[in-house]
Amino acid sequence: MLNGGAIMSCALTLQLIQPRTNLAEKYDFLFQNLHRIAGYEFLGFNNSVFLSERETADRNFAMGYFMKENKSFPANTELQETLDLYFQSCSLEVNTETMAVMGATLANGGTCPTTGEKVLKSSDVRDVLSLMYSCGMYNYSGEFAFKVKSTDC
């Protein structure tokens, strides 16, 4: 069911980020912001993964249509655009150095340690880290919190 949350996040993103732009412009906006979070380290797009994700997406389409039927999406959500953004997001590539800088940016309260640029609001970082803690490890989601038994919760 984690894909449902990611698909909903894409639907919300499309509604909230530069609402008067097309899908390509929205993706470029997101890509550039991720690049800033990564301190301009390597951030790529794998078209083969994108095409594979789109060609084998029956379950994601079914989930999307289920969510649409139940009026879960914001008004005027285009399901195909939402799923395309989801597939594009699944097709991003980073290396370990890039991932380390992205993690360090979160650990540094939203300030990229390599550029010194404040790229995320502290409140957004707090929310992202909370989501990552509870449901950001895919099939291992939630289990980490119970095994670690953190007292910060």
Which residue stretches match the model-derived regions?
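Active-site-proximal alpha-helical segments within enzyme catalytic domains
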Residues: 8, 93-112
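Cytosolic covalent-transfer regions centered on His/Cys nucleophiles
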Residues: 82-86, 90, 94, 109, ...
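Short helix-capping/linker segments at secondary-structure and domain boundaries
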Residues: 16-19, 109-114
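Active-site-adjacent helix/loop patches that line small-molecule binding or acyl-intermediate pockets
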Residues: 1-89, 100
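Conserved SxxK-family serine transpeptidase/carboxypeptidase catalytic domain
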Residues: 113-153
